[in-house]
Amino acid sequence: MQELKKLPVGFENFQEIRKLDFYYVDKTKLVEQLLENWSKVNLFTRPRRFGKTLNMSMLKSFFEIGTDTALFDGLYISQNEELCKEYMGKYPVIFLSLKGVDGLTFEEARSALCELIAGEVRRFKFLLNSSRLDNDEKNIYRDLISLQGEQETTLATKLKFSLKKISELLYQHYGQKTIVLIDEYDVPLDKAFQHGYYREMVALIRGLFGEALKTNDFLQFAVLTGCLRVSKESIFTGF
């Protein structure tokens, strides 16, 4: 009798689930659907516990340069050999989950966002040794590793341009535009509403997303997931 696979209770990392041979509900058709109908910014809203984070992790594993292609063996998307050849493992990927961006004050929440972005930037430390980046660009990368401890205006500016800057540096290194994945984009806004600093957080997120997703020449496309469809007037104006 064939042994049943374990359920991935508490797991949201696609790579872990596949490598540990947990039971996986194949959602890789999402890759095909995304590439057939993609726009520059793609927003998916679903209820909580609907597998959004796992799907985003799967997208990261599919598109990111250096991916283990064996993770997709036997899954739906592997049948589309032409698509896999063209897109699998071909892009730098920035992946952020904003579900932990919270705080009783705006400053606390902003600090959490700064640390989250800096943590993702640290994944790309190879840029410090890149022959395709000059010293000024490497200094920009060093600044992005730590977004804390700056004066108010300097911090606000660095944070606003952080995702755009790191995508530019990745483009300089790889010669390929970046895919940006932002999971639970609405959590900081929901928490800000609860704690009374919604206007400040809307302004922060609008500025960050505006630079990273709207006026970014180094963006291939972006995927955002959340539970709330925040009004276009507040966040996605002009997208």
What residue ranges belong to the model's regions?
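Phosphate-binding site recognition
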Residues: 1-239
